[in-house]
C-alpha cells in the first residue's frame, strides 16, 4: 500500500465520556487524566513518530478524510460527529499507519477501524480484504453488524466465524469469498488448518479488538499461529482497554512502527452523569431490597449483575414471578439463547437483564437507565465495567450496589479505588418490608423451578448447562470464545 502524506490532526482535548480504567503512563498523564493523549508506540525506538496537533476542532467525519458515501452511512446510523477515538485514529489509519488504540467499550472504536477499512476496500475491491479478531462470539456478531451497516451502500459481505456454530456452513460462507471476516481466534484457526482452499494470503487489514481480553482468555498461542500465516504486507490495528505487558508483546510481534492513540482517564474514573450509591442491608433481605429498587425505577431499562450462573437464573425466575419483564444472560446459555436475550433487551420487549459479568464489557447495549450490583464484583476494575453500562454518551444513569455484612471489605476497596466515598441510598425499612410476603412467595416458586431445571438437565446444581473444566484444566479451542460467567 502506498504511503500517504501525513495529515495534521485537528483536535482539541475534551473529557472522555466513557468509564475508563486505563493506566496512566506517567505523572504528567495523571495530571491530564481527562485529556486524549497521543503518543508513539514503538517502545524500542526513542525517536518514535509523534503526531502534531492543531487547535481547530474536528466537526465531521468528512473533516477526517472519510468519503461522502461513508459519511452518508454514518449519518443514517445516527453518528452525528466523531468520538475522540475516531477523531484521533481515523486520519492516521487513512495515512496507512499501523495503530494501537487504547479506549473503552462504548467509545466508538468499531467505527474507528471499520471506516478506514471500508474506504480502502472501496478504492481497491477484493475478497478476503479484512480480518477482525474478537474475544467473544457476541462481540464478533456485533462487529459484523456494524461493518454491514456502514458498508451497506457498497453491499459489503461479511462472514462471522465463531465457536459453537456448524463448521460446514461456515466453510461454505468462506467459500463465497466475503470481503470481511469477523472471527474468534480458535474457530478461525480450525478453518485455516482444516478447510480446504481457505487461505488469508491476500489479506490487507488485520484488527485485533479488545486485545487485552483476547490474551486474558488464553488466545495468545492461537494468535501466534494465525499471525504466522498472514502476509507481512498488511495494515494492523490493535485496540485494547489497557496496555499490559502481554499486549505490548503482542503489538511488537504483529505491528510495524505503529502509532498509539490513547483516550485515557484516571484508572478508576467514572463520568459525572453517573449517580452511584449503595444500600447497606442484611444479607437475608437482598431479594426484597432488589425488588423495591426495581419498583422505584419501574419502566426503565436495568441490568442486575450477579456473581454466579445459578443466581442469575434464580433471580430472573423470581422477578418474572413478580411480574417484571426479566431475562437471564450468562455463559452457560447456548449461543442462540444469549443472542436472543440480548435482542429482547435491546428491543425493550424485556426491560430487565439479569446477568453475570458476560454483560459488563464488550456487548452493544446502547441505553441502560439503571445498573444494580446485586452481588458485588470481586475487584474494582469489574465494578467500573459494570457501572459503565449506564450514563453513556452524555446521558445520565444510576448505579446501585447492595452491600451486606459480608461485603464491607470489598466495598471499601472499591471506594478506595474510586478515590471517594459514595452516598448511601436511604430508604425506610418499613416501606421495603411491605414486599416481604410477595417476595417470599416468589422465592419459593423460583426454588421449585430451579430444581426442575437442574433435574431436566441432569445437573446436581453446579451449573445449568454442561460442566466447567476442572480447576487448572484448559477449555477446548471451540469453547474459548464462550464467556465463563
From Swiss-Prot:
Q: Does ATP-binding appear among the keywords?
A: yes
**Where are the annotated segments for Disordered?**
1-55, 449-485
Principal location listed in the UniProt entry? nucleus
Where is it located? Nucleus
Entry binding sites for ATP = 103-110
Q: What is its EC number?
A: 3.6.4.13
- List residues of the Helicase C-terminal domain: 285-433
- Return the broad EC class: hydrolase
GO CC field: cytosol; nucleus
Motif DEAD box boundaries: 209-212
Q: Where is this motif: Q motif?
A: 59-87
CDD domains, per this entry?
Answer: DEADc_DDX47, SF2_C_DEAD
Oligomer status and interactors = Interacts with the SSU processome.
Kindly provide the name given to this protein in its UniProt entry.
Answer: ATP-dependent rRNA helicase RRP3
Which species is this UniProt entry from? Ajellomyces capsulatus (strain NAm1 / WU24)
Q: Which gene encodes it?
A: RRP3
Amino acid at each position: 500500500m502506498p504511503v500517504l502524506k501525513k495529515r495534521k490532526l485537528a483536535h482539541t482535548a475534551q473529557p472522555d465520556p466513557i468509564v475508563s480504567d486505563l493506566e496512566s503512563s506517567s505523572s504528567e498523564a495523571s495530571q491530564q487524566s481527562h485529556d486524549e493523549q497521543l503518543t508513539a508506540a514503538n517502545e524500542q525506538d526513542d525517536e518514535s513518530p509523534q503526531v502534531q496537533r492543531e487547535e481547530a476542532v474536528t466537526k465531521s467525519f468528512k473533516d477526517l478524510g472519510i468519503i461522502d458515501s461513508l459519511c452518508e452511512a454514518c449519518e443514517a446510523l445516527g453518528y452525528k460527529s466523531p468520538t475522540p477515538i475516531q477523531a484521533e485514529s481515523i486520519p492516521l489509519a487513512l495515512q496507512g499507519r499501523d495503530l494501537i488504540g487504547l479506549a473503552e467499550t462504548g467509545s466508538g472504536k468499531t467505527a474507528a477501524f471499520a471506516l478506514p477499512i471500508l474506504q480502502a476496500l472501496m478504492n481497491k475491491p477484493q475478497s478476503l480484504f479484512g480480518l477482525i479478531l474478537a474475544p467473544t462470539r457476541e462481540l464478533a456478531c456485533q462487529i459484523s453488524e456494524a461493518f454491514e451497516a456502514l458498508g451497506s451502500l457498497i453491499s459489503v459481505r461479511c462472514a462471522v466465524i465463531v465457536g459453537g456454530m456448524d463448521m460446514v456452513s461456515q466453510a461454505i460462507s468462506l467459500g463465497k469469498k466475503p470481503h470481511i471476516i469477523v472471527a474468534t481466534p480458535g474457530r478461525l484457526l480450525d478453518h485455516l488448518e482444516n478447510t480446504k482452499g481457505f487461505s488469508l494470503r491476500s489479506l490487507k487489514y488485520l484488527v485485533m479488538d479488545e486485545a487485552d481480553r483476547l490474551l486474558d482468555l488464553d488466545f495468545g498461542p492461537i494468535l501466534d499461529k494465525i499471525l504466522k500465516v498472514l502476509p507481512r504486507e498488511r495494515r494492523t490495528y490493535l485496540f485494547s482497554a489497557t496496555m499490559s505487558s502481554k499486549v505490548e508483546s503482542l503489538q511488537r510481534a504483529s505491528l510495524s512502527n505503529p502509532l498509539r492513540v490513547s483516550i485515557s482517564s484516571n484508572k478508576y474514573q467514572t463520568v459525572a452523569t453517573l449517580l452511584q450509591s449503595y444500600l447497606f442491608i442484611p444479607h437475608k433481605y437482598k431479594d426484597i431490597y432488589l425488588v423495591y429498587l426495581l419498583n422505584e425505577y419501574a419502566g426503565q431499562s436495568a441490568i442486575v449483575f450477579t456473581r454466579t450462573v445459578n443466581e442469575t437464573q434464580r433471580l430472573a425466575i423470581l422477578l418474572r414471578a413478580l411480574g417484571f419483564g426479566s431475562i437471564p444472560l450468562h455463559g452457560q446459555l447456548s449461543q442462540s439463547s444469549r443472542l436472543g436475550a440480548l435482542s429482547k433487551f435491546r428491543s425493550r420487549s424485556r426491560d430487565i437483564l439479569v446477568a453475570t459479568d458476560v454483560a459488563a464489557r464488550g456487548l452493544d447495549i446502547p441505553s441502560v437507565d439503571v445498573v444494580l450490583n446485586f452481588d458485588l464484583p470481586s475487584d474494582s476494575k469489574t465494578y467500573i465495567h459494570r457501572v459503565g453500562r449506564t450514563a453513556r454518551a452524555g446521558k445520565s444513569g444510576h448505579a446501585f450496589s447492595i452491600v451486606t455484612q459480608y461485603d464491607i471489605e470489598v466495598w471499601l476497596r472499591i471506594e478506595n479505588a474510586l478515590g471517594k466515598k459514595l452516598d448511601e441510598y436511604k430508604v425506610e425499612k418499613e416501606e421495603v418490608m411491605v414486599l416481604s410476603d410477595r417476595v417470599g412467595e416468589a422465592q419459593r416458586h423460583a426454588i421449585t423451578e430451579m430444581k426442575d431445571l437442574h433435574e431436566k438437565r441432569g445437573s446436581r446444581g453446579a451449573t445449568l448447562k454442561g460442566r466447567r473444566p476442572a480447576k487448572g484444566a484448559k477449555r477446548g479451542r471451540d469453547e474459548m470464545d464462550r464467556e465463563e460467567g
